[in-house]
Amino acid sequence: MMKGSPSVPPAGCLLPLLLLLFTGVSGEVSWFSVKGPAEPITVLLGTEATLPCQLSPEQSAARMHIRWYRAQPTPAVLVFHNGQEQGEVQMPEYRGRTQMVRQAIDMGSVALQIQQVQASDDGLYHCQFTDGFTSQEVSMELRVIGLGSAPLVHMTGPENDGIRVLCSSSGWFPKPKVQWRDTSGNMLLSSSELQTQDREGLFQVEVSLLVTDRAIGNVICSIQNPMYDQEKSKAILLPEPFFPKTCPWKVALVCSVLILLVLLGGISLGIWKEHQVKRREIKKWSKEHEEMLLLKKGTKSVLKIRDDLQADLDRRKALYKEDWKKALLYPDWRKELFQEAPVRINYEMPDQDKTDSRTEENRGEETVSSSQVDHNLITLSQEGFMLGRYYWEVDVKDTEEWTLGVYELCTQDASLTDPLRKFRVLEKNGDGYRALDFCSQNINSEEPLQLKTRPLKIAIFLDQEDNDLSFYNMTDETHIFSFAQVPFLGSPYPYFTRNSMGLSATAQP
């Protein structure tokens, strides 16, 4: 220190002097701390969140300056000063959604209440009390959970010898976890996953799965919030007819080509070894130089043949793969595996009196089971379908009401004059379509259907080996409906009328 300079107290002594000066002016100094919840506060999206904070020790905070803020003190989430809330310094996104709970403010207990919680409200909050020169605060975390919509699962079509399945959902926060699994709980690897955020910060997910194992049957799409135990899931059935079936002649062709390639490879290897021997002999005997040239030409010829065969094989593979993909989209490919049913269709509506007065000669010509319903317009030239695969087509272009499919006897009880019949049919009534499975008065299943194109001709495929009955719209060659994995108890018969069944939950067929 220089001589003559006034003595200056050390900086460490200034704070106690200021406190003593303030004590002398005000007469008292406020000492306190602020406490808040130790664990994060978790609320659902769109509900109400309450963030409490408490002075310790307990004392009145009515005359204090209280501020809740996020990253920066200004602008604030909410400011309480001079006994009222100060809206002019509030963040715009919180206006009209916040209020201070102050019933216990005289004991130093207040809370910030946020209504209609949004995804942007998620994060850290600070509760600050200021009394004169004393200011203390506490931090707390608000976790917002958004449970999105139920998954939408559908098949997008065949791809690479399998079926691609797509699962989508929206309204999640934070980013959800998406999994595929089979009915046994085994996890399946997703082919692709896309997650995007909308303007409100909510996540939309879209994942796809390529199923090549036809034994799986069902797959389940499960979506779960990482901070919430509850999950939302949706299962989808993968029908066997949608999987591509391997043609024996194609397998034989591929095997033959592979064997040919192996043989060519063996021939090429033998030629290469012989070529090496010739090269050693040429070094010893120069007179055999011409023979070496001929051998090289032969080798090039064989290699060219092999390359040509490989190119032709690749071209055929590409053509077969393209044809197979196209075949899956049309019912015609199924006709290659099914035999045409020996049926006869009478497109004129039979008269009741004429039906009752049919001669025995006509009955002998039809050779139809006596249990066939009276108004059936389609007859089979045998006693029911034998075990196998059959298809037939029905023209329905001039009919506003019709029912077609198959039926079988439910019972062979001799005491019943009219044996019970089980129907699996497709029905049209006006503009409405539905698939029905019923026996007598009992409707086993009813499925309303939406068809983009009105069918003028319908093809029915009966597969007794795989227990499958499928209907195709031959107008646009699209699949309508399938009764899958439902066993046939007896010999089925074809069925077609120009009327709807008129069935409800209590009606009798």
From Swiss-Prot:
Its main location: membrane. GO terms for cellular component: cell surface; membrane. Keywords: Disulfide bond, Immunoglobulin domain, Membrane, Repeat, Signal, Transmembrane, Transmembrane helix. CDD domains: IgV_MOG_like. Gene3D superfamilies: 2.60.120.920, Immunoglobulins. Residues 1-27 form the signal peptide. Residues 28-250 are extracellular. It is a single-pass type I membrane protein. InterPro entries: B30.2/SPRY, B30.2/SPRY_sf, BTN3A2-like_Ig-C, Butyrophylin_SPRY, ConA-like_dom_sf, Ig-like_dom, Ig-like_dom_sf, Ig-like_fold. Residues 28-139, 151-237 form the Ig-like V-type domain. Residues 349-372 are annotated as: Disordered. This is Butyrophilin-like protein 1. Residues 272-509 are cytoplasmic. It holds the Pfam family V-set. PROSITE patterns: B302_SPRY, IG_LIKE. Coiled coil: none annotated. PANTHER family: BUTYROPHILIN, BUTYROPHILIN-LIKE PROTEIN 1. The keyword Repeat applies.
